Amino acid sequence: MAADTLHTPRLHTGPAPGTPGISLHGLTLAYGRRVLLRDADAVLPQGSITALIGRNGTGKSTLLRAIAGLGTATGEIRLCGKPLAALTALQRASTVSFVTTDKIRIANLACEDVVALGRAPYTNWIGRMQQADRDIVSRSLSLVGMSSFARKTMDRMSDGECQRILIARALAQDTPVILLDEPTAFLDLPNRYELASLLRRLAHEEGKCIFFSTHDLDVALGLCDATALIDT
């Protein structure tokens, strides 16, 4: 599904492509007493898409959650050059967005209202949006080819369509770093490639640092700029 044509300004611009989006230095992850990752170093630049591959239970979700600030790790994680540990909750919310692997269908909200949730870090305490916020919501729907679904509800949509709406919500959050946990998990093969192609385009054209976990080796090797293997 191609993106719609819509030209609206972004609220702000992120780091230039090629600068570090995610930096890991001596990172160690554990689940209970089991070490999942030990002394790992990696740099993922802006304007790139990287696939995280590995068997079930090797710590892919744990790593993504740690980078999002939702889990614990030793070592250092930097987002756009800044230590994750030094970021406030609001700073983190404007730096990294996270699309989980859960099937989320919000039946009583229109899709544009779901996408508008991504603007929460930028609105006032009652969540009132300005015109710039509404423009970004519209542009986010356009970028994922879902403008015509703006007033529809997710309970009447396919898994692939729902996943696009959740990606649009992450885009509306307007963060330079986007993490996705198994975004192609519930999709058939054609839709897996279509979604991965969309993520690649968003990385290259919007300058995002996109890091996602997947079991689809063909997608990872064929459409991504780099792959990261986690194997314990």
Where are the language model's segments positioned?
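Conserved ABC transporter NBD signature motif
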Residues: G75-P83
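Conserved ABC ATPase "signature" region
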Residues: A116, Q131-F149
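Catalytic Walker B motif of ABC-type/P-loop ATPase nucleotide-binding domains
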Residues: I178-E182
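The feature captures the beta-strand-to-loop junction immediately N-terminal to the Walker
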Residues: I53-R55
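Helix-to-loop junction immediately C-terminal to a conserved catalytic motif
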Residues: A68
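H-loop/switch region of ABC-family ATPase nucleotide-binding domains
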Residues: T214-H215
